[in-house]
Amino acid sequence: RNDLRVPVYASTDMVTYQENEPVSEGMMRGFCMHALAQGADGVYLFNYFFNDYNRGRYHTEPGEQTCRVPHPRMLHELGSRETLEGRNKIYWLSDGKREYGLRPNTPLPLCVQPQQQAEVSLFVGDRVDSIRPKELILFYRTRQPASLRLWLNGKKAMKMVPDYVSIYNKGVKLQNGEQQYAVRLPAKALKQGDNVLRIENADTASEVTIKRIELALKYGSADTHGYF
């Protein structure tokens, strides 16, 4: 055979580390879309088991927006960009946890000094020029109370939405002193490819350490467009 092409498959094993947030349906979509949009030939679903616990049925977390239990229906979505387009999903940066001797390529945890700025980049694989999400939500976790100003691709964040933390089940595994925040970003600011999030610490005296950053793309209700 003259075909020397070697297919490359992305593995989802990074989302199974015990210290990380328990993986959710929306996070799996974001992971797979990220990999496929970067040119992967497919996705290897590591430890993606359908247990007797739920028998393949949906099991949502408090708030009814998030599902953290794998089920067979997701196999119809995760292997193709076409089936992932227009579905609710979450993109996130690695927390920087080290397991099995691996060093994640991530800016987190990120320390921002008082009244200083920092930037991080989040890759989005969705073709947002043709199908734009109805709502764009940024979730971030800090090691202490924080007062941040945020911009996405130069567009300022719209408003804090504290109730989203519980609605989307983002308060899990909080350690002593850690805080979880949610803020709406302008959906028009989102683009396919790298998105620059600029972060400013508004505090005049204390540094802030950002432990987790997640970007949720909401195209519609969880019932019709998928759970987060």
Place the predicted regions along the sequence by residue.
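Pro/Ala/Gly-rich low-complexity, hydrophilic intrinsically disordered segments
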Residues: R73-R103, C111
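Glycoside hydrolase catalytic-domain groove-lining segments
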Residues: R1-Q18
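Short beta-strands within extracellular/lumenal beta-sheet-rich domains
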Residues: V112-V128, Q180-Y181
